Curated annotation (Swiss-Prot):
InterPro entries: DNA_Rcmb_RecR (IPR000093), Rcmb_RecR (IPR023627), Rcmb_RecR_Znf (IPR015967), TOPRIM_dom (IPR006171), TOPRIM_RecR (IPR034137). Keywords: DNA damage, DNA recombination, DNA repair, Metal-binding, Zinc, Zinc-finger. Residues 80-174 form the Toprim domain. It comes from Stutzerimonas stutzeri (strain A1501). May play a role in DNA repair. It seems to be involved in an RecBC-independent recombinational process of DNA repair. It may act with RecF and RecO. Transmembrane segments: none annotated. This is Recombination protein RecR. A zinc finger (C4-type) spans 57-72. Belongs to the RecR family. GO terms for molecular function: DNA binding; zinc ion binding. SUPFAM superfamilies: Recombination protein RecR. GO terms for biological process: DNA recombination; DNA repair.
Amino acid sequence: MSFSPLIRQLIDALRILPGVGQKTAQRMALQLLERDRSGGLRLAQALTRAMEGVGYCRQCRTLTEDELCPQCADPRRDDSLLCVVQSPVDVFAVEQTGFRGRYFVLKGHLSPLDGLGPEAIGIPELLGRVADGAFSEVILATNPTVEGEATAHYIAQMLIPKGLTISRIAHGVPLGGELDLVDGGTLAHALAGRKPISL
């Protein structure tokens, strides 16, 4: 089916979203145009406002509408702990655990093949953030992928000489998981990171 230029432009715009392919974008576009024009206009207005009004926190680099995000503006948080994550969505995930420390958001992970070196993801800014000596522990909460592990290892190499405690989030068997359903790599990490039981 051949679409008009405006419909084609809408479909192409929707395809930039993660997980949205050609067919899904077509269905979304046609749904908005045929059945929910007011919803489409609300979506367009909300998207415009967000793109114009949401920026980055000047301390942790997560998404926020203010100069400081709510976590950085909160004086009750533990200033001795810094959790390093790969993206703003990771801040929201860690917040669900009840973590009360501070954050630093990288812009992804090291990937030399994609041209993403330490400067591109913000490692110099991270080193600047810990330079004042306020933090006693840095928790590396990058993703458990090859790139995430490489990023955590690189950061640890940069921070260990500063005398900080450097920790890595644990990886392993999910709570309630069954061993026969866990992949070999995850199970190997779980075995390597085992802890003694104290009674």
